[in-house]
Amino acid sequence: MQIAVTNLKGGTGKTTTAIYLACALSETGSTLLIDTDPQGSASLWAENAPELPFSTVAVPSPAVARQARDLAERYEHLVIDTPPGHPGITSAALTSVDLVVVPLTTGSVDLVRFGTTCELVEAAQAINPTLHGFALLTKTRANTASRRDVRAAIADAGMLPLLDAEIPLREAIAGAEGTLPTSLDAYSQVLDELNARTKGLTP
């Protein structure tokens, strides 16, 4: 599986999602995480937690497209953590993967920027027709009006399909930065749904 995690807005749980997905994927095969963010958040996380069960490399430039294709031959799974506010790097990353996950919270600002990110994904699909995109709600609280409103707004807008799986607001996840994640259940559910929803899909 080759996944890019992207959102042009920061603060949506993007790097956390990339790290957790890489951990979950590593349970089924060798996994590489490519950190394309010039801030190096994922690389710093990996540096502080050398026990992470996957490899990490930093490629904070549009060269990620070429390097990802080369590196993917050595690993069963690939996760690319893309930067906020760098559409050139993000676009390059999206040309080299099969899946893109766009994490967003239930905040109204996230929803506005979500549309811009979706446009970037659509442009990448014109170049990479095998690319399938999904939105993922993060930092959610069950049975809240904001959660229901965001789900309805995304469905009405007809943008990227929204995964049923969600990442709840939990201290174990929010405080995991720089450590080895210990509870992968929510992200394992994300992977299960991605596998189920992309099985048999054609570009």
Could you describe each region identified by the protein language model?
Residues 2-8, 19-91, 127, 168, ...:
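P-loop/Walker-type NTP enzyme "switch/lid" segment
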Residues 175-194:
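C-terminal boundary of histidine-terminating zinc-finger modules
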Residues 32-33, 80, 102, 135-137:
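Structural beta-sheet core signal
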Residues 87-108:
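Inter-motif core of Ras-like GTPase G domains
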Residues 14:
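Conserved lysine of the Walker
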Residues 139-141, 151-180:
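Beta-strand-loop-alpha "switch" segments that mediate conformational coupling across diverse proteins
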Residues 114-130, 138:
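Conserved C-terminal guanine-recognition region of P-loop GTPase G domains, centered on the G4
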